[in-house]
Amino acid sequence: MTISRRVLAAVIGALALTALAQAQVGKTAPLYNTALQKIKDGKQVVCSTVSSPDPDAYCAVANSAADCTWIEMQHSTMTYYQVGDMIKRCGRPKAIPFIRVPDALEGDIQKATDLGVLGIIVPTVDTVEKAQAAVKWAKFPPDGRRSQGGNRMWGENYRETVNANMAIVIMIETPIGVDAADKIAAVPGVDVIFAASTDLGNFSGHPYTGAARKGDTVYEAMVTRIHDATLKAGLRLGGPFAWKDRPGFTFFQGPGLAAFVDAGAPIVIQGGAAQGGGRRGNQKQ
């Protein structure tokens, strides 16, 4: 009987140590989400936009100079199956995959996180509850209510470490959201508040863009309120790539494949001409 008690005590002790070790893994493990690490360090982070389901195009963008990919599922017709195929075929590229989901719904965020992305971008956040939902469905208990799937893209300790590596980006795009900016920025688990330039103008009755928007005091006042609420809360501030030199902004939605092609095609063509032709892509010689 004494031996049984000793064995039972040893088993209980081992289980307790295992649980403690697993808990510590999530707290002390270095971030494999390199984009989130840069976010936390206050460095500039650029996410290149991906709007088409071509795996080769995705891999080209994901292995460029970008910190992360902004996989667009709000304003595109891509399916989760197509996005999953892209991510799977590209493995673990340099740029960390983020997805802009259509809404802060369990089904959308569950699918996105199960695909292996390490960033959830939620559009049109007007309320504290919607920001809380983004965190809730993106993170495992005790930080959220995400159901556990079988993803092992980021290692065997994925379940224990991913909460610390999951970036949450909240987009404020309407006057209602601006009015709630202080409360939204105070939601635990949020990393970035993104001032959505285009829709901020669209939903406020100031739909013009670019140079025409400069000097609009109403529009600029909304941007300033988002700016101040975000930095006051100790979070990082996001915006369009055109704002990369704007004070306080460190997270940006960058250009997509078309911009890379526009910028790179002349270099490739001129380089080929200078070398007298050479190989031409996948064309047979």
Predicted feature locations:
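Bacterial N-terminal signal peptides that target proteins for export
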Residues: 1-11
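Expand to "…catalyze enediolate/carbanion chemistry for C-C bond making/breaking, isomerization
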Residues: 12-15, 20-285
